[in-house]
Amino acid sequence: MILKFIIQQCVFKVAKIFSDNLIQIFMDISSVYSSSTLFFSKLSLLMCKVFNSKCAGISVLNKDGLFDTIAFCSSTQELENFSYSLKKISKNITYYDNINEIFNNSEIIKKYNLKSYMEIPLKDSKEFYFGDIVLFGDQTLNPNILDTNILTFITNRTSMEFEKKKVSDQLIIAKNLLDQSPSCSCLVSRNGKIIRKIGAFYERLLGLEIGENISSVEKSSDISTILKQVCFENNNLSTETTITKKNGEKYPAEVFVKEISDIHSNSIGIMIIVRDITDQIRLKEMNIELQKKSELEQKRNQELMEARDLALTATKIKSQFLATISHEIRTPLNGIITMGEMLLSTSPLNTEQHDIAETIFGSSELLLSITSDILDFSKIEASKLELEMIEFDFIGCLEGIGKTIGVSITNKPIEIAFLMDTDIPHRLIGDPNRLIQIMLNMGTNAVKYTDRGHIVFRISVISREQNRCKIKISIDDSGIGIGEDQRAHLFEPFHQIDSSSTRKYGGSGLGLAISSKLAKLMGGEVILERSKPGVGSLFSVTLNFEQIGSNTLKSLLPDKSFSRNKTCIILDNYEYTASIASQRFDQIFEESNIILVKESTVKKFFELVQEYKINGDVNKIDLKNLDPELLPFFDSSLICIIVFHRFMDNLDIFLKYVKDFIEFYKKKIVVALGINHKNFKNLPKRRDFLIFKKPISSTNLIKVSNMARKIIPKSSSSSNLIQTISQIDNQQQQQQQQLQQQEQEQQHQQQQLQQEQQFVTISPHSDSSEKKTTPKKDRGKYDFNISPLRIDRFGTESTSSPKIKLYSDTSSDSGESDEFEFSENLRELKSDGELVVLKNQPYKEQRLSNIQLINDPIVTPPTPKANSEVVSTKAESTFFQSSSITIKETRSDSVNSVNSVNSVNSVNSLNSENSNNSLDVGIRTRPRILLVDDNAVNRKVVKLQLKKLGYDCDTATNGFEGFEMQKKDNYELIFMDLNMPLCDGSMASKLIRSHEELNNYKSRANIVGLSATYLHGSKDYCVSMGMDDFVVKPLKLQPLGELVKKYLEVENNNNNNNNNNNNNNNNNSNNNNSNSNSNPNSNSNSNSNSNSNPNQNPNYCNNLPTDFI
């Protein structure tokens, strides 16, 4: 018993000592490690030693139901924290010998080789379970090693430390929040002394030390007052005051005051929160200002809404006005154009009358074109323009446009070319008229802004979907280019690249705008792909169409297999268009060798041929040692030579090249000449080579192909081309002797036939039903409807004009009649009557060529012999002369006619001077007048008006030219247009006035400004620029006459005085020499002198017609 008691007491003592030591160690840990994190780590190490476990730790339950260890250690070191889950959660002390029964994290079990698990729950002061003290062992753990009270102590101490850590974390967060707040806090006593300062902004906002009074920061007593109120009323109070810091800086502040008590309701102090409200006050002021602005904006928006409604109404009225006025303008224009065309085509006019009528007609067509543009634009703006969807020949339409643009290029060295892909569809459904309008606008724009170089149209299909296709048309030119600053406004209506008063290029500025809008209506667009000033521009037009059938350009062109492995030479001095021509001819020559050569190579070839002709036989040309660039001319596969003549090249030289090629190759290859429309009329009527107008069309390609089929034999036994030519030479030498004999016999007959010349009259207003037409051949499937629209020099569109055909007694061998465009022939018309054409006999050598009208209004046709037939002699003032026929016997008659007409004209002139009812436009002393205007039509009109009034004038095209002419000739009266390129009227006027002052002119020139635009103050502006007057175009005849008389009156009066003195002297001399009227010459001289000065007529210019222009 005693031994048992002793043993129990020993065990108790040992347990007590162990427990005391454990508690002491625990207390030491708590006091040494103030950081909760270190406390939890040391506690985990202690638990490992006490329970002899492998690992121990502190875990916390998170909101997702998982446990996160905040400390985890082995008996020797700290380990990495981890998360785990339990299969079931027990809030009591629990022990498991098999850890897999409760623990889910297999990776931790394997990593540390754990077998047993024990958990001691942790609860806060409110008995809320929040985590565990966990023990892991690699063997069985003894849960009874510690007393329950000790475990309770440990858990409570751990829970307290955890809450301490939680509060500490919250305090850190609160401090951070207070530091980030733009306010500061302090705790003061009831008398206002600072006890504690809080917040990072404290020093900046208050800067007071502990013990100082809070009232020292304000001059007013606002804070003191509310402190007293808080002490007595125990309420939350706030006020706004101005705080002055120690450094004297002031700022508006909001002060919040509240008394703070402990848990026993004992006052700890008064909390004061100070917040800088400078930004708030500023923001408040800004809000007030913004509110005022908002009210103003609302008012403005209301005004803008009203203005928008007015603008929409005005736009609608404007569109309606444009449509109405354009229609009303078109109605009288239709009459002017129609009657002008009738006047040109049916009336016998002399040169001056024809020029006037043609000017009226051309200007009317130009006005019609501008009016149509305005009407189209107004329709597009009003969304009233509708497309006409019809089937049309797309290829023919494009090539017709190309010919039309080619006709409009008259005086510029521009090469125009079309390049179409062979998969371009033949027939489409769309609006051909709008396609033509777009392409003509784009093409004429390119022509207008290109002075030299090229304009190339490329047509390709960019997409196909079922029966729809999108076609791209690119227009590449070498014009002036477009700057970056102009591109944003390029497609705006009425926009000009150069809108200054000195602009060089005219136009309404609607072309691109209308084209862009029409393209959008047709499912496409117009874009500027690239442009560089001084280099050129590239525009592209994409349009959508519906395709009909599967025919393309490739299917329409003839089979080209016959030309396989053949050679074609193209002569073109312009490399850019030469490459385009090469690609086009490649469309009809399959697997052919197309060689591009320049004029220098052709010269070398003919020099070589000429050298061998002089020194020997052409057959002896050594091809082995020949210059490589000349070898293609002797290639046996050569089938075609195409010669392209450029505008600036000498046409005669290129015609000689063509003729020499034909002569050398003996017509065994195709020789063709490509030429522009302007030079086409200068070609000989009788020719044995193929010719086509540029740009190259599909019809041109077909002609070359067909001629190649006819000329080129299917097989040839000759090894080279020289042998073939030699064989032909031998055959021709045998025939030449026979021809010489025949020519001798024909010479005698020819002399007789030349004496039997006849006159035939072809009336320009003859009935169109009597015209003979030559049926066209070989049309078939190649009939492209590509007749060009006639574009006259004013750039307006017109229908094709009738033609005058000259016929000889027998038709030519070619079966074709010579044709002249009626409009072109009419421009050269100089007669008052019908056309008189000299008809020759049917010999080729004597066929009429180069028929021209003699520019002399007083030459009458010769009297025909008895054996000549006169069909009509109505045109008494016109004579046709053939360059191939000389009529020596008619010269005497012509001289007699001249004398007789001169006599008649003299009598008519005297009669007109003595007539009181006619306009006083007799010959007089002509004042020196200069007209400066950049518009050719304006120059022509004013010059004709002055001529009608009896005055002559010189003309200049810009201000610099006018200034130079004035320096040279010192004109008395200058009509100066205000808007001109290079130098406008105002600058030219200042130059003239400066020149007059520097050179001390005794009298200065009278300068009258001209403009088609009248603005208020225009006359004052002209006077300020040194001019004497200003008038608005168009000028009426009578006001113009009065204006000229006004500024030339002083000079004319001086001339009149001189004339009167001369007349008196003549009269006195006549009276002295004769006492009677026996000398009629003296009387006539006297009368002539008295009537020679038109200004003596008091009714001068009073009866001038007011509607001359």
Swiss-Prot record:
Give the reactions, separated by semicolons, that this protein catalyses.
ATP + protein L-histidine = ADP + protein N-phospho-L-histidine
Mind telling me which Pfam families this protein's record contains?
HATPase_c, HisKA, Response_reg
One of the entry's Gene Ontology molecular-function terms is: ATP binding
What this protein is called in its record is Hybrid signal transduction histidine kinase F
Q: Where is the composition biased (Low complexity)?
A: 739-758, 1052-1099
4-aspartylphosphate: which positions carry it?
A: 977
Residue ranges occupied by any PAC domain in the UniProt entry = 237-289
Query: What domain of life does the native source organism fall in?
Result: Eukaryota
